[in-house]
Regions:
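N-terminal secretory signal peptides that target proteins for export/translocation
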Residues: 1-10
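Bacterial N-terminal signal peptides
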Residues: 14-27
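Periplasmic c-type cytochrome electron-transfer domains
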Residues: 28-468
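Enrichment for repetitive, rod-forming helical segments
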Residues: 10, 14-17, 148, 465
Length: 468
């Protein structure tokens, strides 16, 4: 089992690049050792989320309202937070986004174990939801191997005290594999874990022009490295969740969502089964399981202020105004690791800084927010999608992101993350680096550069990453 904290890994050095193509990445005995120091602790762990600096009083009100709703526990019927299901993955946003505090990523202790039987539900916990593993959503491929790309919710409301006579069955996810890594088992299923939302408003506020300008400016440095990358942008057609109006989408593992509002609307529907103005259709239309004929979530124009906006707008407001992660105080080791991060090529994709343009903070605002506009975002991402090869490929196409392509994951806050990569297969940041290499990956040369560093240099680079 993968455990949080120190765990030694042997890092091979001097490995010919051609070996990477065949996935021969197993650590070899007799070489220097670098070690993942584990999840970085901070005084803010478990504390209340911090908003962006410089918010106005009104913006702070919308942030706090969004935070409250982000933590609400949804129910099937009765009360004010109703509409859960009939198929769902969890019953509150914050259950999946709580490491190191609300708005973060998957926690060390999987909350879905308790959600399975909440309020009398009769769900079985799927094999890939381990008590000490990450929160995972499941996507089925079709029987002929062509992926459908859709999330298939792991739980149903059957048996709950607030579900009435609704009776539907869970999907069948067997045969089982490794419950912690999610590897092995049913080859027809791929997994995704939650992405952190800290600093998401700054990412949303980065204009397309800045992303494209950096792509052009870095083209020369990428020559000969195998690194390419392109925006997830599709020309033509009607605007949808993948933003095929030609603009650059940027949220999600494949940068499939353009805006935080779209990101929130899709998650509310897909993860909790709650219909809303952007996604009005139920996840399951079985008779007897339809509590409401209209979307559960909508704007309430009979109220005023923050109470007017729908839940998905409130979620978007919270994420938009949530401050970015705070890095640790630099040390000699992390400063040297930062320099190595650049020199071996990691920064070719994990761009340290991009700058925002004009941006509003809440759905009801009409003027740019000083807290979001023209700010430096130290996200460590170019917001492009890259070919990551056969080792990481999930076979899913979303927008212009193909079966083995993923968005460059922003690394701010990575030092406090427990699980890594799109499916949460490892809690060891060194293994996550090694898994960037494989047949067809743009990162092969960069991983090779890491592997030929001395053990001391490797350790400094790892320490730098854990300081973010």
């Amino acid at each position: 089992m993968c455990k949080i904290g120190a765990r030694k890994r042997r890092i091979l050095t001097g490995l010919p690049l051609s070996f990477l193509t065949f996935g021969l990445l197993a650590p070899l005995a007799g070489f220097g050792q670098a070690q993942d120091p584990g999840v970085r602790k901070a005084t803010t762990d478990g504390a209340a989320p911090v908003p962006l600096h410089g918010l106005t009083t009104d913006e702070q009100t919308f942030f706090q309202d969004g935070l409250t709703r982000f933590q609400n526990v949804e129910v099937v019927s009765g009360g004010t937070n109703n509409g859960l299901g009939p198929r769902f993955n969890s019953n509150q946003c914050s259950s999946c986004h709580q490491q190191p505090f609300v708005g973060g990523s998957s926690p060390a202790a999987n909350p879905l174990i308790a959600v399975a039987s909440a309020d009398g539900a009769t769900n079985q916990v799927p094999w890939f939801e381990a008590p000490n593993g990450p929160v995972r959503e499941a996507r089925f491929r079709t029987s002929n191997g062509v992926p459908d790309g859709g999330v298939h919710d792991i739980f149903v409301i059957t048996g709950r005290s607030d579900a009435g006579s609704c009776s539907i069955a869970q999907p069948v996810f067997t045969p089982a594999g490794n419950p912690v890594t999610g590897q092995g088992g049913n080859p027809n299923i791929i997994f995704r874990i939650p992405t952190p939302t800290m600093g998401a408003g700054l990412i949303e506020a980065i204009p397309d022009s800045a992303i494209l300008a950096h792509q052009r400016a870095s083209a020369g440095a990428k020559q000969g490295t195998g690194v390419g990358g392109h925006p997830n942008a599709i020309q033509g057609g009607n605007v949808n969740r993948s933003g095929n109006d030609g603009t650059i989408t940027r949220f999600g593992w494949k940068a499939q969502n353009k805006s935080l509002l779209m990101f929130a609307g899709e998650a509310y529907n897909v993860e909790m089964g709650i219909s809303n103005q952007l996604f009005p259709q139920e996840r399951d239309e079985t008779p007897g399981c339809q509590g409401y004929p209209t979307p559960n979530d909508y704007d309430n124009f009979s109220s005023s202020g923050a109470a007017v906006v729908s839940d998905i707008e409130a979620f978007a407001d919270f994420m938009r105004m949530l401050a970015p992660p705070v890095p640790a105080t630099p040390t000699a080791s992390t400063q040297h690791g930062n320099a190595l991060f650049v020199s071996i090529g990691c920064a070719l994709c994990h761009t340290p800084t991009l700058t925002t343009g004009n941006a509003i903070a809440s759905g009801s605002a009409t003027l740019p927010s000083a807290a979001l506009s023209h700010q430096q975002a130290n996200l460590f991402s170019d917001l492009l999608v890259h070919h990551m090869g056969s080792r990481l490929a999930d076979g899913i196409t979303q927008g212009a992101a193909g079966p083995d392509e993923f968005r460059t994951a922003p690394l701010w806050g990575v030092g406090q993350r427990v699980f890594f990569l799109h499916d949460g297969r490892t809690s060891d940041i060194i293994m996550a680096i090694l898994d960037h290499a494989g047949e067809g990956s743009e990162a092969n040369q960069i991983v090779h550069n890491f592997q030929v560093l001395s053990a001391a240099d490797q350790q400094d680079l790892i320490n730098f990453l854990r300081s973010l």
